[in-house]
Amino acid sequence: YRGFGLKTRHRKLWDNSQLITNIYSANIETYKKKRELVGAIDSHFSSQIGNGWNVNAHLRRASQDTFMRRYGFNQNTSLKSSISASRTIGNRYYLVEASDRQSMLTSDKTTNEQTILPYIFYEKEEKGWRQNQWFRTEISALQLDNDQDHDLARWSGIFELSEEFQTPLGVTSYQGNLTGNYYSLHEKPTAATSSLGEYSFLTPALSVGWRLPIAMTS
């Protein structure tokens, strides 16, 4: 394949922030033309703001489907742009994220370019009523569009209780959880066999374990 390309890299650091940007520009042979002006960007920004919030943003976009792979700039078949903010405070974790995916394959370009607006996640772990008992709560919400031409919303929750017991014959443990999921499917392809509507699931689970710690000295 004939043509020429230019990759420009820019990096900037300040305070608690960092920006790294790669810009690709080229005049090359594509499947459309002998010479076509094409371009792409791959940029990453990270920062810590406020009271312990970690912010990350990625911008990845290309003006043409194949030139990044064909000329060895990037071998991925899709480019994902996203922005997220996360925070950990003691025994709690928070995450908010939005993303959009650009497919580099013409065959699935209109049906598999997922957009997430947004994804929200919360987790908390705390001691239970007894010394070696732990209680974990996990809650998440998701709006997902254009996933194989489906649009859906999902809410999930996990409530988990676990405990360990020291015995003369080793350590026994149990873990029990209750998982709840609620789905709202509000868009689908005409040919799909799935049905639009709302669905909910409640799933209990229980596991029991035993282990025997062994110490070896030399």
Could you say what each language-model-derived stretch is?
Residues 1-218:
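Outer-membrane beta-barrel proteins and related beta-barrel translocases across Gram-negative bacteria
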